[in-house]
Structure formats: structure tokens, C-alpha cells
């Protein structure tokens, strides 16, 4: 049984290492939203936590968010955590461009594009589906 756990841990750790640095080098999907940045941030964070609930286990998905009131911005990171590493597979940056308008940039690691499409669906109100 412990060998099986070690193998799963090694696989999760290897996957996390492969994801390292992949997010930042990829093209950004930009979405304009007719809502204020804080409203967009809170709605996205709620959907993200619904679709990526905190779990226990060898390979976990994790969602973290930060809101910067003075900077009129927010950031949500989607990560894969293993016992030995944590690597981000998607970043969502939200910036208020006007009082009721926001710009959202989505960067995703290769192989995780369906997750970015899900986020876009949440933003545009065309889908509430989880991947």
C-alpha cells in the first residue's frame, strides 16, 4: 500500500514540475466584462471554488485569490499541489478599466485550455460548467 502511495506522489510531483513556468510563456486570452472589477473577482472566485473544491489527497487542485482595492485589480491562481511541489496551471488577472467595466486576462499552461474556456464561459454568462 505504501508503494502505491509513493508512486502516486511521484506522478503528482512530476506533473507539477512539468507545469513549472508553462503559464507565463503562453498567449493570454483577454475578455472585456461590463461589470466592476470587484464584482467580477468575487463571482469568478465563487465559481472557481465551486469547481475546484479543496480536497485531500496526493494531487490536489487549489484556488487562491487576492484583491487589490487601491489598484482596482484582482488575481485568481489555479494550482496543482503535490506533497513536494505546487505549480500554477492558470492565472486570471482582473483589472478595472472603468467603474463598471473590467478587463480579464487568462493565462493557462499547455493542456489546460479547457479550463480557460470554462472561465471564459463563466465571465460571459454562457456557461456555469466545471471541467
Which role does the model predict for each range below?
Residues 1-12:
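Bacterial N-terminal signal peptides that target proteins for export
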Residues 18-21:
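C-terminal motif of bacterial Sec signal peptides marking the signal peptidase cleavage site
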Residues 24-131:
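Ser/Thr-rich, low-complexity intrinsically disordered terminal regions
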